[in-house]
Design a protein with these regions (language model features):
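Acidic, surface-exposed loops and disordered segments
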Residues: 1-217
């Protein structure tokens, strides 16, 4: 499976089988996180065999069951933190999909995580991780015209990027992002209000860049 296939096949999964993640897959995820943290300055952490965080009333209310592994998206407080966590967190989530694992972005439906949060840092959200009991289902998406703008005929690479962005997971499926092509540059912004819209924007930007081969401002 390549990363484009992973974007198409990754769906949110909330219920997990009682199956341990193999050591080689753990190592691959840890190696990727090390690269990401060096590149981004974030402090993303992965917690294996830690069931307490999702053994809570909030987690069960959110219909999470069997979650024993998760990724904690942590970084220094700042205006760009949420977007960076979305961008780099999805990079890990897609690697997990390539490795045959399942994931789900989790905002509030969990208990206290075991991540180590240093002074001046903040935990933005978590990503549940493991072998899902199902592969999840596709979410409904907005029309391409609702999340993109161009002042010229839409290039094929831009179309591919927007299509991939529409496959990005967003909080309560809100998809409050906009991609605009101006000249040869792409700008992505949040429009409207909502929970975790900046995190959603980061996820969508990563999808766009992977599928289009172009950077987004």
């Amino acid at each position: 499976m390549d990363i484009l296939q992973a974007i198409e096949e990754r769906h949110s999964v909330r219920q997990y089988a009682d199956k341990a993640i193999e050591q080689e897959k753990r190592q691959a995820l840890c190696d990727e996180l090390k690269k990401i943290n060096t590149e981004s300055g974030l402090n993303i952490q992965i917690l294996f065999d830690e069931p307490q965080c999702f053994d809570s009333m909030m987690a069960h209310y959110g219909k999470f069951f069997g979650v024993k592994n998760y990724i904690a998206l942590v970084g220094k407080k700042g205006k760009s933190l949420e977007e960076k966590c979305g961008y780099y967190g999805e990079r890990v989530a897609l690697l997990a999909q390539i490795l045959g694992l399942n994931t789900c972005w989790v905002a509030m439906s969990h208990g206290k995580s075991a991540a180590k949060i240093e002074r001046g840092e903040k935990q933005v959200c978590l990503i549940a991780l493991g072998y899902g009991k199902t592969q999840g289902v596709a979410h409904k998406s907005k029309a391409m015209s609702e999340v993109s703008k161009t002042d010229v005929a839409m290039p094929d690479w831009f179309k591919k990027g927007v299509e991939a962005a529409l496959l990005a997971p967003t909080a309560i499926n809100q998809q409050k992002f906009m991609f605009e092509l101006s000249g040869d540059e792409v700008f992505a912004t949040v429009y409207g209000f909502g929970f975790y819209v900046k995190t959603d924007l980061g996820i969508a930007k990563y999808h766009f860049e992977v599928a289009s081969g172009r950077s987004v401002k």
